Amino acid sequence: MGIPKSSIYFCILLFCIISFYLQSSKDGPKELKVKYVFLKKATAKQRGESSLTDSDYFPKQPNMNATLFMLCRNRDIKDALVSIQSVEDRFNHRYHYPWTFMNDAPFTKEFITATSKMVSGDATYVQLNNEEWGIPINIDLNRMLKSIRDMTDDKVIYGFSLSYRIMCRFNSGFFYRNKALSHYDYYWRVEPGVEYSCDIPYDPFRKLSDENKAYGFVISMTDYYETLPSLWNVTRDFIHQNPQYLAQNNSLDFIVNDHQGLSGDYNLCHFWSNFEIANLNFFRSPAYTDYFAHLDKNYGFFYERWGDAPVHSLAASLFLNKSQIHYFEDFGYYHLPWYHCPTDVQSHATARCLCDPTGTIDYLPFSCAIKWLENINS
């Protein structure tokens, strides 16, 4: 009597399993393990979770005296939650730094409930007063309104908006004075709707402190001349009146081309301030305080449309030594419509970053990233 076919099939299957096991015992499991770890990281990324475990990070040290800061309105709740989730996942779930939220109106119960559930640290909610969120009392209202009309007709970006001008003035000279931030040494500005595409395997606040840096950025680009035609002249007047504030090893070569110094024209390069990590004592310094007062009495936030980004950038470039400014090149960051993505192989080979380095803003003609690197190396 012959052997049943089912037994033959079973023996063949058993032989295949044993052969596979013997082969994999030599070199298979190591390869399979690598594939599994990679797939596990990719799946975590798809879920929006961090890819790194605690052992992948530098040893954790005590937190710095710092806060994450967001200026927003109640209607920004969805975008605010996107930003909070991104920062918490990529960084803060390990550190639990507090958040400070500011608004020119009272925060709604819905906003407070939703955001406080998502943050991993304490949350503080602040309503701004009329001095912080307003226009100077001595301003020429007719001139301001004419400027708004003219910029609206000329289609200057945000030229139509009074609230945008008020926001830029607040971010230039008032946020760091607010009582809610008065006891902090460092802050990290987070705007609604931004996303971080790389895990952050260290504490950037501590990095600034350990390396004696006062200001950190991730994207730099040129600004719109139509928004700030007189800002550089007003700034130069301030430096000529207060030469003691000009840092010896400043970054004039970043903001002025061809090593022309203060005699040259502003090249419009600035740090995009929707992301910045900074020592608040820089903004509280006599140099910055006097500089903002000088700008404010010229009313350029309203007669023109000065932004807080060029104001911060000019101040940092002039009042700080270049070694005190840090380029967070290893951060992955998106703010509509641009993003920065690290270009080193390791960040992508380890799945630390989930972004396309070929599309980073640094390669575009209006980026000032190369200009900054030239300034550092000069």
From Swiss-Prot:
Please report which protein family the annotation says this sequence is part of. Belongs to the glycosyltransferase 15 family.
InterPro entries for this protein: Glyco_trans_15 (IPR002685), Nucleotide-diphossugar_trans (IPR029044)
Biological processes, Gene Ontology terms: cell wall mannoprotein biosynthetic process; protein N-linked glycosylation; protein O-linked glycosylation
> Glycosyltransferase: present as a keyword of the record?
yes
| SUPFAM superfamilies membership | Nucleotide-diphospho-sugar transferases (SSF53448)
EC number per UniProt: 2.4.1.-
Annotated TM spans: 7-24
Q: What is its main location?
A: endoplasmic reticulum
* Compartments, as annotated in UniProt: Endoplasmic reticulum membrane; Golgi apparatus membrane
What are the protein's UniProt keywords?
Answer: Endoplasmic reticulum, Glycosyltransferase, Golgi apparatus, Membrane, Signal-anchor, Transferase, Transmembrane, Transmembrane helix
Cellular component terms (Gene Ontology): endoplasmic reticulum; endoplasmic reticulum membrane; Golgi apparatus; Golgi membrane
| The protein's enzyme class | transferase
Functional note = Probable mannosyltransferase involved in O-glycosylation of cell wall and secreted proteins.
One Gene Ontology term of the molecular function aspect: alpha-1,2-mannosyltransferase activity
Q: Which segments sit on the Cytoplasmic face?
A: 1-6
Write down the species: Schizosaccharomyces pombe (strain 972 / ATCC 24843) (Fission yeast)
Name of the protein:
O-glycoside alpha-1,2-mannosyltransferase homolog 3
Its membrane topology: Single-pass type II membrane protein
User: In its keyword annotation, does this UniProt entry include Zinc-finger?
Assistant: no
Where are the active-site residues found? E276 (nucleophile)
Q: Name one Pfam family in it.
A: Glyco_transf_15
Where are the Lumenal topological domains? 25-378
Quote the PANTHER family the UniProt record gives: ALPHA-1,2 MANNOSYLTRANSFERASE KTR1, O-GLYCOSIDE ALPHA-1,2-MANNOSYLTRANSFERASE HOMOLOG 3
